[in-house]
Amino acid sequence: NEVNGTLPAGSVYDYGGSQWQLAGFVAEQVTGKSWKQIVEQYLVEPCALEVFEFGNMWSSLGAWDGTPDSLRGQSNPNIEGGAISNMQDYAKILTAHLRGGWCGGNRILSIDGVEKLQTNRTEEFQRNYGMGWRISYSTDKTPYLYWDPGAFGAVAWIDTLRGIGGYMAIDDYDTSSSSAAINLLIFEVIPLIESAVDTARGKLP
């Protein structure tokens, strides 16, 4: 009973949002808990996050003003693009990806889990994409820069060679020109940061 147009797994790169909803549904069935309860148990509590939660601002986008109090749809969240956070919470999550899955003193991901997230699964389709991460390579063809552009002008990134990461939030954002901000970060800002870090350390990573 395949949906019309469905292609075999691993045969094509086809980015979309429905797969995240399906993964969330599977997690709910396996654990017997709601997505909100799962996120609280495995992410919010062990990382001591203050704001981070999933909702569905897309159901009434005009009513969402970017604040936690205006978020709706927590009972049936949009998993692909429905999470909100502050900078402190986001920093904890990014740091966990750089520290082998450790968030403070609590492990939220196994080392194997972190590696699977960062594995390039679409190279044969001329794309560099893992599980949620877009992947860039160093001059010696080593994967090291993992980045993820958000729906509202945010781009998170980690540099596994240097052990650093960051988050860029864009105040004046338009989806029609989103690539300009992303390209600015990836091709201009991050190289400047890499150079500054290398210079400060007195050596290449």
Where are these regions (language model features)?
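A short, hydrophobic secondary-structure junction motif
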Residues: 117-119, 156, 192-198
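Short, gly/Ser/Thr-rich active-site loops of penicillin-recognizing serine hydrolases
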Residues: 138, 176-205
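Short, surface-exposed loop or secondary-structure junction motifs
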Residues: 1-148
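Short, surface-exposed beta-strand/loop micro-motifs that present aromatic residues
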Residues: 144-146, 152-165
